Amino acid sequence: MAPVALLSVSDKSGLLPLAEALHRIHGYQLLSSGGTAKVLEQAGLPVTRVSEYTGAPEILGGRVKTLHPRVHGGILAKRGDAAHQNDLEQQNINFIDVVVVNLYPFRETVAKADVTWDQAIENIDIGGPTMVRSAAKNHADVAVLTSPDQYDRLLEAMAQAGGEVPAALRRQLALEAFQHTAAYDTAISRWMDQAVAADGSPWLEAVPLRQTLRYGENPHQKARWYSHAQQGWGGAVQLQGKELSTNNLLDLEAALAMVREFGYGSDGAEPAVQPAAVVVKHTNPCGVAIGSDVSTALTRALDADRVSAFGGIVAINGVVSAAAAGELKSLFLECVVAPSFSPEAREILAAKANLRLLELQPAAIDAAGPDHVRSILGGLLVQDLDDQAITPSEWTVASQRPPSSQEQQDLEFAWRLVRHVRSNAIVVASKGQSLGIGAGQMNRVGSARLALDAAGDQATGAVLASDGFFPFDDTVRLAASHGITAVIHPGGSLRDADSIKACDELGLAMLLTGRRHFLH
């Protein structure tokens, strides 16, 4: 008896070449249902409809098509098992040797802003995953394909094996099939969990492997990058440069989060986008600035600390212009990310073949979701991203002297930066430019010393931001000794009064935000 291939796909790409090869080259009978059968018939291929084979019509508007013993018996039966063979003969069931199924586009459906509950529910596939799981379970005898990108692999292997599907390939395809159905069910569970806001649900996600990286943070560590296509960095387009590394991705993430504080879009002229640039090393910023255009912002960000910028990562929140590209070309950098690059900028930067240029559109960022996930031994920590809007109207003036208009602007700028610096974090800034950044010290005054020393004489007339409260008045007094005129911090220390008193004695303005921004 001729081998049988069952084909039932929502994505018709590559279907006809596969079906033609199975039938005309390898002699397969084609069994199909619904729209897939119609496509095959229109192409002139002989096909038996599932409803004809089972003797049962499609019912419930297509909800039940393939859920039938003649389908699943043919998939699950063990070849060479006498009892199974007898059951098939008694029920007039044929072996099914190849199953080609891809599932209703649930993830794509629920990603639409205007999707309704009923539309989402109707795109939950039932028969498809059931056939995939049956075929994957019986991979000793059955090959299962769930994606068009597997079709050529199957046909090439069959051509080399005289029409047979090698056992190793069947096993690999079974693995991919179970991964596919697991990811599909996870997507449904995630959507429904968010829709009904269930408390205590397990955190589920199935993220496909995008790339095996050269190594991890260090050469002796293996690393892999998992990402959904078109979501977050999975939606970035690398225009040129070497392969991305683990450290590149970590630094890009940090740089992007910070530059988005000032808006992010493909057109730097958009009112919501204040042209800004960020330079990052080891996930900490070494220079951040805003400007009248992205070129000015970039120059100011680099001027904040040109020594540390060497080998850094740059993020820009608007179109990279020719002028900005000229500045970038003069430096040794690892990566530059922006919503887009002008043709002139691309031409200028093409001379730096190893420089990684990435275009990342706002839509890909928005599709990435709100969860921040980190691993710990034997588990995960999942929290909301610390990306709530800055609300100066909710801040409190704690000092006798309120900040001046310029100080207020500088304090807002510094507060946007400090939540992206590793705790304990201190930022010294003035007129839309970071001047000194103190990160990761075990005591707050230690971070303040680093930031103030980096700012040097420029600290005079500048402001200082702290991601956590001042536990003592030492940071305020140190800041004043370097010429700082205003400070901002969350407040909440038992000794807040001491720091406020020091500000009043020394003539500093102090704002309390009421919100801490630790970063570990």
UniProtKB/Swiss-Prot annotation:
It holds the Pfam family MGS. Pathway: Purine metabolism; IMP biosynthesis via de novo pathway; 5-formamido-1-(5-phospho-D-ribosyl)imidazole-4-carboxamide from 5-amino-1-(5-phospho-D-ribosyl)imidazole-4-carboxamide (10-formyl THF route): step 1/1; Purine metabolism; IMP biosynthesis via de novo pathway; IMP from 5-formamido-1-(5-phospho-D-ribosyl)imidazole-4-carboxamide: step 1/1. Residues 1-146 form the MGS-like domain. Its EC number is 2.1.2.3, 3.5.4.10. Gene3D superfamilies: 3.40.140.20, Methylglyoxal synthase-like domain (3.40.50.1380). It catalyses: (6R)-10-formyltetrahydrofolate + 5-amino-1-(5-phospho-beta-D-ribosyl)imidazole-4-carboxamide = 5-formamido-1-(5-phospho-D-ribosyl)imidazole-4-carboxamide + (6S)-5,6,7,8-tetrahydrofolate; IMP + H2O = 5-formamido-1-(5-phospho-D-ribosyl)imidazole-4-carboxamide. One of its GO terms (cellular component) is cytosol. GO terms for molecular function: IMP cyclohydrolase activity; phosphoribosylaminoimidazolecarboxamide formyltransferase activity. GO terms for biological process: 'de novo' IMP biosynthetic process. Keywords: Hydrolase, Multifunctional enzyme, Purine biosynthesis, Transferase. InterPro entries: AICAR_Tfase_dup_dom_sf, Cytidine_deaminase-like, MGS-like_dom, MGS-like_dom_sf, PurH-like. The IMP cyclohydrolase activity resides in the N-terminal region. Belongs to the PurH family. PANTHER family: BIFUNCTIONAL PURINE BIOSYNTHESIS PROTEIN ATIC, BIFUNCTIONAL PURINE BIOSYNTHESIS PROTEIN PURH. HAMAP family: PurH. NCBIfam families: PRK00881.1, purH. This is Bifunctional purine biosynthesis protein PurH. It comes from Synechococcus sp. (strain CC9902).
